[in-house]
Curated annotation (Swiss-Prot):
Name of the coding gene: dusC
NCBIfam families recorded: PRK10550.1
Name of this protein: tRNA-dihydrouridine(16) synthase
High-level lineage: Bacteria, Pseudomonadati, Pseudomonadota, Gammaproteobacteria, Vibrionales
UniProt cross-references to Gene3D superfamilies, sorted A to Z: Aldolase class I (3.20.20.70), Dihydrouridine synthase, C-terminal recognition domain (1.20.225.30)
Active site per database record: C98 (proton donor)
Record-annotated site: Interacts with tRNA: R35, N95, Y176, R272, K274, Y279, R295
Biological role: Catalyzes the synthesis of 5,6-dihydrouridine (D), a modified base found in the D-loop of most tRNAs, via the reduction of the C5-C6 double bond in target uridines. Specifically modifies U16 in tRNAs.
Length: 318
């Protein structure tokens, strides 16, 4: 089976990819989306969101990274796909699934689910423009409101000659509600089409992964939010490893501190780590207590000092 670390705008950046691919056996990663407008984007935009381009489009641990593009104009999507390929992208992924309101209002992401013909045009333009040895893939939801629309959408992607398709098994209207997951539609898609598929949505542990495989008939899975809830989720889903114990998560928080503070995003560190705690609290009750201690801290040094002190207390308690 394959397990892929999916994209999450504003969260799964290159620093998080580097850290999570060091402790998980991911087959590849997908970047946060590169927003395509009506012009060629400068190289620094691609390098900012995918600095791995400077090292063969791989993380430091050697995991391939695809560049994801989000936009609605076939010409400019293709032009920027060409540039990403020239910069060395391992693959080009096209975002037709982002449910964010601001993205949809500008006719990007999931908004295109209402226009399968435009999806076809974007996919075809990118596939025709990019050298054949570089895969062009897409990511969709089941539809805007009606999951039955997925078949026409998938047909558009397939007719555009995409090499692979990730299906998030909810509609845009379904948001991220667990009750809205519909893995059975991925099975129906598999039976009706020939395009290779990746299943995505509500995969939080090994049992979920196995249930998804059994329901969909697909053994390629993408994880996103869950990878932040439990940092070693990739290995849990792929190899049935135990969830990382809390003290190891704290060690990882300290490691993340080194990445963020020494990297190019140090000034954002307080917000970034607090954002991560919002996910960790879903799986680790201890995270809520630690978050209460640091949530009012605004200086990097104060947060780092508190984390070190907390880790020392854990060692004493053990």
């Amino acid at each position: 089976m394959r397990v892929i670390l999916g994209p999450m705008e504003g969260v799964l950046d290159h620093l998080m990819r580097e850290m999570l691919t060091e402790i998980n056996d991911y087959d590849f990663c997908v970047t946060e989306f590169v927003r395509v407008v009506s012009q060629p984007l400068p190289d620094h935009v691609f390098y900012r969101l995918c600095p791995e381009l400077k090292q063969g489009s791989k993380t430091k641990n050697g995991v391939p990274v695809k560049v994801q593009l989000l936009g609605q104009d076939p010409h400019w999507m293709a032009e920027n796909a060409i540039r990403a390929a020239q910069l060395g992208a391992h693959g080009i992924d096209l975002n037709f699934g982002c449910p964010a309101k601001m993205v949809n209002q500008s006719k990007g992401g999931a908004a295109l689910l209402q226009h399968p013909e435009l999806i076809y045009q974007v996919v075809k333009a990118c596939r025709d423009a990019v050298p054949s040895h570089i895969p062009v893939s897409a990511k969709i939801r089941l539809g805007w409101e009606n999951p039955e629309d997925c078949f026409e959408i998938v047909d558009a992607v397939e007719q555009g000659k995409a090499d692979e398709l990730t299906v998030h098994a909810r509609t845009k209207a379904g948001g991220y509600k667990a009750s809205e997951i519909k893995w059975d539609y991925i099975d129906q898609i598999r039976q009706r089409s020939t395009i290779p598929l990746i299943a995505n949505g509500e995969i939080w542990n090994y049992a979920d992964g196995q249930a998804c495989i059994e329901t969909t008939g697909i053994d390629s899975l993408m994880v996103c939010r869950g990878a932040l809830n439990v940092p070693n989720l990739g290995n849990i889903v792929k190899h049935n490893h135990r969830a990382m114990p809390w003290h190891e998560v704290v060690d990882l928080l300290l490691k993340y501190t080194q990445y963020e503070v020494r990297g190019d995003k140090g000034k954002y560190y307080p917000n970034r780590i607090k954002q991560w705690f919002a996910y960790l609290r879903q799986a680790y009750p201890q995270a809520a207590d630690l978050f209460r201690d640091i949530r009012t801290l605004t200086q990097v040094e104060s947060i780092v000092e508190h984390l070190h002190h907390y880790r020392e207390q854990l060692e004493v308690a053990q």
